């Protein structure tokens, strides 16, 4: 109940706003996210990726940029059509392997019948998703949103222009190709169309021809194996068929692939595996006996390396290698006298329609991503792209792997190929440059579908897009609309290129690499993408998020449960980069309480006080400030620097660490040290709010408007001094060491802390020798630490020889002295104390007394080294 009341309080404070971004004199920043597919509501996995783009857009706004972050909805492809078709079959009484009816009911719809029409999906889920993201308080300009497919005439025309242009540039071709194919949908099945088997590709399989009285049995064979025995499952289904004037028998799964890869096949009969049991066959001139066993096993030839006839084994090996390199023709399979090659999926693939996929030789229109000249340009684009090292490595690997991409489909929603309207353009190919339309969509039409027209849709043609994107002259028929189109062109040239593209890491080898290819092909280099950020999958409570397991949460469920600001804070700390992240509900709950305390802290500080200190005025009095005040000033400045760097790197866990947790800890320590300056505390609260604005914008807006008044922008570090920060770290470390040593004492009431003012004479001499040699190295531009790693340093032996002389002089054990010297050589900063240890400990001995229960006496002693006080318990 406490959490719910505090959540209601936070929600009441949050200030929403509409985001509008237009062409202006300011610097622009254009952020885009890979639009989601519209076959359901948005879930936390979507929101995690979206949050990365949203956080960064607010950050750039703080920096003074004119930020554009638009959002749209992808409807192209077969999943929606397949689900609608499957639902119709389910409602008519057919048995299904996965209930679409239950899925839709679980999404909150009582009447499922309208969903038998694919268009109903397209007109339902985009609106729901938009409402969810508005509740999330995203920094999105909703005027620019749209849906894809030919339902939207503007998008349809835009995609037709894209493919006409690719065709003009010679990037398209037509032919046959082995593709993963869904027999239910009767078309190729891409990764996005699969329920199981993402990234699975066709693989060539070599079969051995085993001849017998009834025909030829096709069996799998291992390379180098001389046939001696065949094994079949007695209950397995086999198909007898005629092909090229021969009668063959093959397992049903093998036959379904073979039948889709060659013409002229005629089915004759079906038999079980026991039909072949006990029969004698001939393979490569050797007699082969067939065993039918009571297991569901593939039909396979077994054997060994034939030592009596090594030439036969070598012949079989060479034949298999040869046929593996031979491609099928458009009508015939690759074969020799004893072998036949076909293709099958390398692993099981199930389409979203529930069909078990095969490999088929299909007519296809292709995008020639294999073009070496095109790849060179994309490589240059990747080299200049700002991204993490692992993202770049995956993109470069994808660039090597990618070849021709079949983009024509016969089933689903989308845009038809302009010159071959029998086919649709696939969903991964119509989603590569749509970000360009964001820059001017609101000048053409107002709604998602293009029904509320500003520019007449009956005037759409390639001439429109050529004018906007290629700076071509306006045609006579478009002259009446030149003002609209001129605004479109101006807006495109102002906002392009994309400054940041955000998406899941699973899209790097398909959508995101296609995105780069198409931008490189269709736009000038000045319009190529500048930065890309990808993230891993999101787990929920340390387990994979899955509807079937019940471990699943939609955006709306999270916002209902934890509110906007707590959900956003939890998303920020889930994880960064391409590693899988983890949304933990207990963390989200905890953020409700933490944010409530944060707001109350500011309310208590500011209520009844007139506080609005100028940083310049505070800095004027910095030299006269006490230890605690200087400590807090330094900590604020340092955390601002760290949090700003984290914002720039998109490592949001660190933003929360330095912008929230470290600030709260600093405030607590400030009070322990006796600090009472409300103006510095006000500065801390304001800096926290500024740094957290990209994460919790609507709550930050309330705090800004209510307490901070001033023009709100990104704070900047204002101090390089860290003496008091070092002093507090020293104080904490001294307490930690003291407590550890106290545990070993039976009874003690008093502790003397012995502080060193300078190092012992032998240490000072060693340090002087090292400083002198290090200075010589610096003059010669030699990195001693790097040389030590390689073991080839010419200066380290010189240092050791000089140090040995000092150790002999003072009678110091050699091992002890050299260890000290090498540590000083590598970490000289650890031996420099920038504050007065004695004064720090004496002024704050109460801190140690309160935490240990001991009376503390601080004194200077030559026995102690600077930075490492000694303890004497009494």
Curated annotation (Swiss-Prot):
It is an enzyme of class 6 (ligase). A motif ('HIGH' region) lies at residues 36-46. It catalyses: tRNA(Leu) + L-leucine + ATP = L-leucyl-tRNA(Leu) + AMP + diphosphate. One of its GO terms (biological process) is leucyl-tRNA aminoacylation. The keyword Protein biosynthesis applies. GO terms for molecular function: aminoacyl-tRNA deacylase activity; ATP binding; leucine-tRNA ligase activity. It is found in: Cytoplasm. A motif ('KMSKS' region) lies at residues 544-548. Keywords: Aminoacyl-tRNA synthetase, ATP-binding, Cytoplasm, Ligase, Nucleotide-binding, Protein biosynthesis. ATP binds at residue 547. GO terms for cellular component: cytoplasm. Pfam families: tRNA-synt_1. Its main location: cytoplasm. Its EC number is 6.1.1.4. InterPro entries: aa-tRNA-synth_I_CS (IPR001412), aa-tRNA-synth_Ia (IPR002300), Leu-tRNA-synth_Ia_arc/euk (IPR004493), Rossmann-like_a/b/a_fold (IPR014729), tRNAsynth_Ia_anticodon-bd (IPR009080), Val/Leu/Ile-tRNA-synth_edit (IPR009008). Belongs to the class-I aminoacyl-tRNA synthetase family. This is Probable leucine--tRNA ligase, cytoplasmic. It comes from Encephalitozoon cuniculi (strain GB-M1).
């Amino acid at each position: 109940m406490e959490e719910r009341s505090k959540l209601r309080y936070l929600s009441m404070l949050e200030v929403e706003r509409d985001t509008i971004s237009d062409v202006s004199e300011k610097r622009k920043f254009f952020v885009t996210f890979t639009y989601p597919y519209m076959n359901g509501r948005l879930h936390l996995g979507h929101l995690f990726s979206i949050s990365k783009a949203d956080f960064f857009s607010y950050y750039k706004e703080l920096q003074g940029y004119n930020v554009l972050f638009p959002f749209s909805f992808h409807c192209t492809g077969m999943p929606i059509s397949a689900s609608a078709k499957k639902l119709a079959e389910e409602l008519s009484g057919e048995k299904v392997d996965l209930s679409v009816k239950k899925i839709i009911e679980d999404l909150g719809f009582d009447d499922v019948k309208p969903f038998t029409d694919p268009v109903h999906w397209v007109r339902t889920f985009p609106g729901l998703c938009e409402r969810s993201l508005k509740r999330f308080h995203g920094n999105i300009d909703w005027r620019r949103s749209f849906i894809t497919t030919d339902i939207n005439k503007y998008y349809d025309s835009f995609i037709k222009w894209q493919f006409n242009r690719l065709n003009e540039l010679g990037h398209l071709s037509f032919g046959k190709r082995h593709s993963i194919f869904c027999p239910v949908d009767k078309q190729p099945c891409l990764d996005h169309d699969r329920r199981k088997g993402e990234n699975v590709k066709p693989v060539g399989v070599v079969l051995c021809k085993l001849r017998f009285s009834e025909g030829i049995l096709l069996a799998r064979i291992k390379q180098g194996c001389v046939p001696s025995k065949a094994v079949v499952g007695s209950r397995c289904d086999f198909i007898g068929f005629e092909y090229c004037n021969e009668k063959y028998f093959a397992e049903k799964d093998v036959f379904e692939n073979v039948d889709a890869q060659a013409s002229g096949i005629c089915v004759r009969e079906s038999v079980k595996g026991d039909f072949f049991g006990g029969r004698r066959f001939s393979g490569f001139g050797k007699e082969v006996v067939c065993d039918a066993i009571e297991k569901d096993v593939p039909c396979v030839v077994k054997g060994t390396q034939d030592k009596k006839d090594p030439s036969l084994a070598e012949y079989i090996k060479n034949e298999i290698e040869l046929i593996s390199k031979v491609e099928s023709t458009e009508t015939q399979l690759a074969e020799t006298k004893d072998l036949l090659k076909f293709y099958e999926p390398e692993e099981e693939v199930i389409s979203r329609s529930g069909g078990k996929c095969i490999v088929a030789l299909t007519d296809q229109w292709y995008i020639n991503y294999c073009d070496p000249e095109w790849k060179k340009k994309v490589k240059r684009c990747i080299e200049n792209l700002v991204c993490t090292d692992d993202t770049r490595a995956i993109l470069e690997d994808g660039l090597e792997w990618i070849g021709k991409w079949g983009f024509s489909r016969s089933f689903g929603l989308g845009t038809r190929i302009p010159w071959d309207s029998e086919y649709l353009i696939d969903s991964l190919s119509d989603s590569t440059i749509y970000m360009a339309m964001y820059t001017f969509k609101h000048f053409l039409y107002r709604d998602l579908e293009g029904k509320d027209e500003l520019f007449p849709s009956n005037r759409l043609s390639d001439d429109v897009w050529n004018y906007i994107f290629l700076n071509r002259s306006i045609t006579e028929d478009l002259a009446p609309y030149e003002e609209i189109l001129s605004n479109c062109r101006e807006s495109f040239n102002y906002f392009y290129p994309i400054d940041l593209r955000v998406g899941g890491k699973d899209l790097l080898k398909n959508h995101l690499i296609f995105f780069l290819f198409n931008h490189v092909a269709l736009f000038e280099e000045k319009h190529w993408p500048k930065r890309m950020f990808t993230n891993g999958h999101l787990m929920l409570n340390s387990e994979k998020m899955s509807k079937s397991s019940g471990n699943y949460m939609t955006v709306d469920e999270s916002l209902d449960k934890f509110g906007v600001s707590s959900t956003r804070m939890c998303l920020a700390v889930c994880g960064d980069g391409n590693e899988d992240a983890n949304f933990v509900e207990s963390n989200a709950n905890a953020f409700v309480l933490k944010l409530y305390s944060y707001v109350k802290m500011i309310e208590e500080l500011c209520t009844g006080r007139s506080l609005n200190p100028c940083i310049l005025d505070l800095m004027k009095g910095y030299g006269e400030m006490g230890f605690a005040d200087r400590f807090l000033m330094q900590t604020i400045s340092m955390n601002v620097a760290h949090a700003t760097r984290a914002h720039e790197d998109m490592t949001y866990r660190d933003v929360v660490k330095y912008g929230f947790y470290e600030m709260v800890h600093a405030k607590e320590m400030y009070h322990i040290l006796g600090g009472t300056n409300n103006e510095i505390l006000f500065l801390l609260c304001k800096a926290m709010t500024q740094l957290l604005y990209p994460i919790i914008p609507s709550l930050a807006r309330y705090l800004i408007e209510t307490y901070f008044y001033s023009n709100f922008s990104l704070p900047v570090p204002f101090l390089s001094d860290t003496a008091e920060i070092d002093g507090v770290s020293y104080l904490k470390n001294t307490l930690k060491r003291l407590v550890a040593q106290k545990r070993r004492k039976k009874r003690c009431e008093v502790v003397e802390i012995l502080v060193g003012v300078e190092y012992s004479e032998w240490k000072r001499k060693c340090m002087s020798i090292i400083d002198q040699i290090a200075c010589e190295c610096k003059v010669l531009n030699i990195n001693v630490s790097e040389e030590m790693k390689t073991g080839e340093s010419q200066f380290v032996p010189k240092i050791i020889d000089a140090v040995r002389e000092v150790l002999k002089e003072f009678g110091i054990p050699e091992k002890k002295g050299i260890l000290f010297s090498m540590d000083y050589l590598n970490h000289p900063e650890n031996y420099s104390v920038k504050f007065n240890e004695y004064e720090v400990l004496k002024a704050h001995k109460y801190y140690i007394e309160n935490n240990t229960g001991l009376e503390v006496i601080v004194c200077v002693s030559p026995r102690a080294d600077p930075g490492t006080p000694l303890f004497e318990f009494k």
